[in-house]
Amino acid sequence: MIIVEVTGGLGNQMFQYALYRRLQLLGKDVKLDLSFYHTKQTLRKFELGIFNLPLQVADQREICRLKGYTNDASRIQKAFTTRIYKHPCIYTEDLDKGYQDMVLQKDSVYLSGYWQNECYFKEIRNRILEDFTFPQEVTDRKQDMVRQMKGSNSVSVHVRRGDYLQSGNAGIYGGICTLTYYRKAMD
């Protein structure tokens, strides 16, 4: 069995799902680990549910078995020892290496990473585009909102939060999402 860890916001979830879907279409026994969203370490929510996707979710027993945990004590021990020795059933994406074809060859592994490289899913691009199509259901509330937007000079502002807000990441993202940036966008 392969388990793909899902973390982060919607964009990261979409890349992780794309790898999951590719592995699934390769005939692999693959499931998703959504446990990140059940902890207190994040305010983020699992958002892929808006697409009504075919998801197989791993239960805690399957996750623990693949990661080599049997109880809380072994979990603590593994957390300490994996800093020194890599666990053979856990593969953490090495961002410096880029695309790693061997990820698609594995059969029994826990995959942790963002997988933000189209090579992981470009062969199933059309399927992914299909999967990420919003449902066509139009509620009264949505119709009312469309009428309001058409009847006025509408503007949408998206404020990036999370990783962009952390001062240590300013250099990575080029400082593009500063308070000044948002003020200029709204002027």
What are the residue ranges of the model-derived segments?
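N-terminal pre-catalytic "stem/leader" segment of glycosyltransferase-like enzymes
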Residues: 1-45
